[in-house]
Amino acid sequence: MKRILPLGLLFAFLPAAHADLAAGKRKAEACAACHGADGNPATGQFPVLAGQTARYLYLQLKDFKEGRRSEPTMAPFVAKLSTQDMLDLAEYFAAQKPRPFAFKADAARVARGKKKAEEVLCTMCHLGGFSGQNEIPRVAGQHPEYVIKQLKAFKARTRTNDAGSMTSVAQTITEQDIEDLAHYISSLE
């Protein structure tokens, strides 16, 4: 009990971080050219941020800022972000609705992708429906081009900010599996 009380007092004096959605919306204007004003990009070159878990978004912004995740396009945007900026942006994009985009999934690829997802146990982390949780991203409805890009980056170990889980899984999948998984994941809502 003597140890718990001082620890409790310490936490009582720490400032609580609260996200400001209105501030997040204003800050997101700098993101709109690539990610869309509401986190729904016009092209598969960039990820859908709308509806993504706030914790995941915050951690990715932090990783970009601190150099644990590399993407030259992101570097100038994250360089001057404060912790509060990142919290505001994460909560703003998490609160937005992902919109469907034009994508004609190949039924055979979707079936093969679903089978591969079951084999490598994707839903153990990404949950059923690939909705994500906390620091695990929502990947359902993500653009297939972006899914392919990220799976290839994990496989090539050029993206390693995942504590090793995706990097390990990616070593077990083929190029065909990557294409099939992208069709399956992109077909989900």
Model-inferred region functions:
Residues 13-14, 19:
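N-terminal signal peptide c-region/cleavage motif recognized by signal peptidases
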Residues 35, 65, 126, 155, ...:
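Protein kinase-like catalytic domain
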Residues 39-69, 75-81, 114, 118, ...:
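Gly/Gly-Pro-rich "capping" loops immediately C-terminal to redox-active cysteine motifs
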Residues 79-101, 145, 150, 171-189:
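C-terminal capping alpha-helices of c-type cytochrome domains
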